[in-house]
């Protein structure tokens, strides 16, 4: 499911060292119909801009 993709992306991002809340906020901004890989890529772009 699409929300499953988002959950998977959030968990991958937390494994990379982001907090659950940072990852959730970034993932929430991304189209949930994308693949897990695409969601992660776009979330990383969002998160890297915040630093």
Tell me what each language-model feature is.
Residues 32-34:
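AAA+ ATPase "lid" subdomain C-terminal helix
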Residues 36-51:
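Amphipathic alpha-helical interaction/assembly segments
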Residues 1-27:
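Strongly charged, low-complexity linkers/loops
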Residues 27-30, 43:
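A general structural motif at alpha-helix termini
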């Amino acid at each position: 499911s699409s929300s499953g993709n988002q959950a998977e992306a959030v968990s991958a991002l937390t494994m990379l060292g982001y907090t659950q809340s940072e990852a959730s906020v970034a993932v929430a901004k991304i189209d949930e119909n994308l693949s897990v890989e695409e969601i992660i890529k776009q979330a990383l772009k969002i998160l890297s801009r915040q630093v």
